[in-house]
From Swiss-Prot:
GO BP of this protein: isoleucyl-tRNA aminoacylation
Protein name listed in UniProt: Isoleucine--tRNA ligase
GO molecular function annotations of the record: aminoacyl-tRNA deacylase activity; ATP binding; isoleucine-tRNA ligase activity; tRNA binding; zinc ion binding
Cofactor: Zn(2+)
Motif window: 'HIGH' region: 68-78
Keyword Aminoacyl-tRNA synthetase: yes
Organism per entry: Prochlorococcus marinus (strain AS9601)
Length: 968
């Protein structure tokens, strides 16, 4: 019977057992250290891995892996790179593409060779032959590969781990010989004496990509004077005409060329000085009656540097200075002025360039034009040799500069010495300076196919677009590529040299034969077998005339041949590949070496699209280094550090979420504060999924499924929003804009679900009768949301997605989320008119919630259900949406009162008295008042009419009916 609104004793009885409470095994805490490996074991047992993509029936999609170097622990750069690739591959797999991802490793080169040598005792090193070194290097590389592979797997990376490509494999080495051979036969590879970047610390030539340029390099720069010994008659006549008071003989006997250099050790190799024909030069006299030649535009700077008062006697064009002769600074011979190019400027120095053709590229080029000697004064260790005269035995990185400077000072040739800060190339492995040194090397002549390479760059899509300009400018300006190295751990250049003479033996028969041998036996036979066994049978008789070459190929030629050794050879892949994805430094590395070899052999690029990412920095934007103590270790992110409070175990999915959250086109920060924020986002997504799963524990889609038009408006909107979010996330994945995925996911889980739909749904889910339509329709929607949410997040949060899927309480057709395929929805789920109305009503809801929160902050109320809302509209759009809701909405679900989670809502023409708060805003007046009636002890709504419940409790009519029907 109806109760009277009289004060009665409060009951301690709880209706909790009568509510449909959340029930799921999907835990609030991820416990990733345990749960993620369990999920990976589930994948392994059920072949839920890269094979899913391989078995798809769609178009082949090939993301070709740029091989990391097989040395050292994994770092954040690896994480950024590999997770980006995995996100793309998983998305393409879900889209039905045939995806077969083949991870690779770069295995040859100096770092591994040095590691092997460092691990040996000195006597072992002395007795180590090349074959044993190569065996130890192979073993070391395999250990490193296995360590890195286990790390990649723990990150949730899918790939053909049983068949990766390794540059040390026989099949790879054979294919690489094939690339070299075709380039040689096409006329693009030659042997010549040329200055190359040489590392005295590594004792080998280096490619441009093996250099780095530290910011704090200082060179000992010097200005020196060179005594002029012969001047052209034209200049002499001009001088006499303009300087009547100075005798011709005085000008001839007291004139000096001024030059500036940052490499004093190259002075013994001087063969000329070069001028720019377009620059104006002057002869200027000082107070000591010495006449100096230098660029006119540098007059003031030189006068200040030398602390001399210089008076200009004669101005000449650079072109007039050709063939003026001068006394070599350290040798008993005359040299001359030659005409150089635009590399000679007036930005620094004197405008006259010391030219040593054996120790500089520009010097070499001008030397070729004038047939100058290519004098190399340095040996492989950086020691000055016999061609340096009295400086023999000194070292370019140690004492040579000081000895030569002292010599110049003693002979009154040194004008000034100063330290000069500039960019200077260092060996990227030993971190020591390099030099230019002319040696006999093997080169790829880029000039032969430069125009084709530039056209290939135009044909490729570069992301970001700035990458195209960057690699284009590099290829336009690059010289020939030095591909030979003087080391043992690499693929040999398959050439034979005549023992007596300069002839070489290298042709199609040799190349094909070596390629076949390497395919069967591997490259070690180059050092193991004698010449007779390496040569084709027709050359066996003359084998005694030949010796094997000892050079190996540049490791960039190794990795740059991967399109031939992997994409071309494996039927499950395609060439050109759809995508190359690496750090932005690879424009000068792997992107370029792959492009050059592919164009030289097949006249096409090896890729259709190139995507680049930046570098991982600390939270303050600094480069990570052990010395700064700011290195973020991906292993610690996943498993935690020694102190779990300061370094908690976040798991692989938080690492993956970081990758999706950043604008990877630029350098990206990572650190403890960022990880905390990401972990918070991860928890919100996880808790949203848990709420969805927990509230469909008794739902059966085979019984309670509905057409869209059977559902309440709120449910129709939610499904329409799911379609919109799916479209947005699909576009983000398609365009590789993963940070948009991150933003959309956050907004969907927090704003659309937690703060709106699921907040409103609590009453429907908990309080309704189990099988009531208002509850089942909500469960239907939630089942659609949770299933598709799992798929949408699976490329990024792969472990959480699978965990969600395994906790769906009803039977699904697919065993794994990755077998589901990408969501496809009926277009009828989209409803623009409905969206507009609900957007208007959500705006009103936000304003009303602010007013209610104001009451709560004043401690006038606790829950929103303790209030009623009166709304006096001033916004016609919102008013129309309220009328629409009243006309078309479900009385069980779409009452705006229930959307607000208040006990009553009315549109009024006048406000009443006794307000808790009145808020005026653009939408109208919002009045919050105390809820009338009594609180229902089950649903907590306030009703004017209540009924007696169990043990002196009060129930609203709805709850009273449910209790009477289901629990009595």
């Amino acid at each position: 019977m109806k109760s009277q609104n009289s004060k009665e004793q409060k009951s301690d009885f709880s209706y909790k057992e009568t509510l449909n409470l959340l029930k799921t095994d999907f835990s609030m805490r991820a416990n990733s250290v345990v749960r993620e490996p369990e999920i990976q074991n589930f994948w392994a047992k059920n072949n839920i891995d890269f094979k899913l993509g391989s078995n798809n029936s769609g178009e082949i999609f090939t993301l070709h892996d740029g091989p990391p170097y097989a040395n050292g622990a994994l770092h954040m750069g690896h994480a950024l790179n590999k997770v980006l690739k995995d996100i793309i591959n998983k998305y393409k797999t879900l889209r039905g593409f045939r995806v077969h991802y083949v991870p690779g490793w770069d295995c040859h080169g100096l770092p591994i060779e040095l590691k092997v040598l460092q691990n040996l005792k000195s006597d072992e090193r002395k007795n180590l032959d090349t074959l044993n070194l190569r065996k130890k290097a192979t073993d070391y590389a395999h250990i490193q590969i296995n360590n890195q592979m286990e790390g990649f797997k723990r990150w949730g990376i899918w790939g053909d781990w049983d068949n990766p490509y390794l540059t040390l494999k026989k099949s790879y080495e054979s294919a690489q010989i094939g690339v070299f051979g075709k380039m040689f036969l096409n006329g693009y590879i030659y042997r010549g004496l040329k200055p190359v970047h040489w590392s005295p610390s590594s004792r080998t030539a280096l490619a441009e990509a093996e250099l780095e340029y530290p910011d704090e390099h200082y060179s000992k720069s010097i200005y020196i004077s060179l005594k002029i010994t012969k001047i052209s008659e034209e200049i002499l006549l001009n001088f006499v005409q303009e300087n009547l008071n100075i005798k011709r003989e005085f000008f001839e006997n007291n004139s000096f060329i001024t030059i500036w250099t940052t490499t004093p050790w190259t002075i013994p190799a001087n063969e000329a000085v070069a001028v720019n024909p377009k620059i104006k030069y002057v002869f200027a006299i000082d107070e000591e009656k010495r006449i100096y030649l230098f660029a006119k535009d540098l007059s003031t700077e030189i006068s200040n540097k030398f602390n001399k008062d210089l008076k200009v006697l004669l101005e000449v064009k650079g072109s007039q200075l050709e063939n003026i002769e001068y006394q070599h600074p350290s040798k008993n011979k005359n040299c001359r002025i030659v005409i150089g190019g635009d590399y000679i400027t007036t930005e620094s120095g004197t405008g006259i360039v010391h030219t040593a053709p054996g120790h500089g590229v520009d010097d070499f080029n001008v030397g070729q034009k004038y047939d100058l000697p290519i004098t190399c004064v340095v040996d492989e260790k950086g020691n000055l040799n016999e061609y340096s005269g009295q400086f023999q035995g000194s070292n370019v990185l140690k004492d040579a500069n000081d000895l030569i400077i002292e010599y110049l000072k003693g002979n009154n040739l040194l004008l000034l010495q100063e330290n000069y800060k500039h960019r200077y190339p260092y060996d990227w492995r030993t971190k020591k300076p390099t030099i230019f040194r002319a040696t006999e090397q093997w080169f790829a002549s880029v000039n032969g196919f430069r125009s084709s390479a530039l056209q290939a760059i135009e044909d490729v899509e570069w992301m970001p677009a700035t990458g195209k300009k960057r690699i284009y400018s590099m290829v336009v300006g690059r010289g020939d590529w030095c591909i030979s190295r003087q080391r043992s751990w690499g693929v040999p250049i398959p050439v034979f040299y005549k023992k007596n003479g300069n002839d070489i033996l290298l042709n199609s028969e040799i190349i094909n034969h070596i390629q076949e041998l390497f395919s069967e036996h591997g490259a070690d036979i180059w050092w193991d077998w004698d010449v007779k066994n390496l040569l084709p049978e027709k050359y066996a008789r003359e084998s005694d005339l030949w010796k094997k070459g000892t050079d190996t190929m540049d490791v960039w030629f190794d990795s740059g041949s991967s399109w031939a050794a992997v994409c071309e050879l494996r039927s499950e892949l395609k060439y050109p590949a759809d995508l190359y994805l690496e750090g932005s430094d690879q424009h000068r590395g792997w992107f370029q070496s792959s492009l050059l070899t592919s164009v030289a052999v097949n006249n096409k690029p090896p890729y259709k699209k190139v995507l680049t990412h930046g570098f991982a920095l600390d939270e303050n934007g600094r480069k990570m280094s052990k010395s700064l103590g700011n290195v973020v270790d991906p292993n610690i992110i996943i498993n935690g550090g020694n102190n779990k409070k300061t370094e908690p175990a976040y798991g692989a999915d938080v690492l993956r979420l970081w990758v999706s959250s950043v604008d990877y086109s630029v350098d990206v920060p990572i650190g403890s504060n960022i990880l905390k924020q990401l972990a918070d986002v991860y928890r919100k997504v996880r808790n949203t999924a848990r709420y969805l799963l927990g509230n469909i524990h008794d739902y059966d889609p085979n019984i309670d499924s509905y057409e869209i038009d059977q559902l309440p408006l709120l449910d129709q909107w939610m499904l329409g929003r799911l379609v919109e979010v799916t479209d947005q996330i699909s576009n983000a994945y398609e365009n590789y804009e993963f940070s948009k995925f991150f933003q959309i996911l956050q907004s969907f889980c927090v704003v659309d679900l937690s703060n709106f739909y699921l907040d409103i749904a609590k009453d429907r889910l908990y309080v309704s009768s189990k099988s009531q339509f208002r509850r089942r329709s909500c469960q239907f929607v939630m089942s659609k949301v949770v299933e598709n949410l799992a798929v949408l997040i699976s490329p990024v949060l792969c472990h959480m997605a699978e965990d969600i899927w395994q906790n769906i309480p009803y039977l699904t057709k697919e065993k794994s989320v990755f077998q589901r395929g990408w969501p496809i929805f009926a277009q009828s789920w989209k409803n623009q008119i409905l969206n507009e109305h609900i957007a208007n009503l959500r705006n009103l809801r936000v304003e009303i919630n602010k007013a209610i929160e104001g009451c709560r902050n004043k401690q006038i109320i606790g829950a929103a259900l303790e209030t009623e809302v009166n709304y006096l509209p001033e916004d016609k759009v919102v008013k129309d949406s309220l009328i629409w809701l009243q006309e078309f909405g479900s009385q069980d679900v779409d009452l705006f009162r229930d959307w607000l989670i208040v006990s009553n809502f009315q549109v009024v023409s006048d406000l009443v008295e006794n307000s808790l708060i009145i808020d005026n805003n653009a939408l109208g007046k919002i009045q919050i008042i105390k809820a009338q009636g009594q609180k229902c002890d089950r649903c907590w709504h306030y009703q004017k009419e209540t009924f007696n419940g169990i043990q002196n409790t009060k129930l609203c009519k709805r709850c009273s009916n449910i209790i009477n029907l289901e629990f009595t």
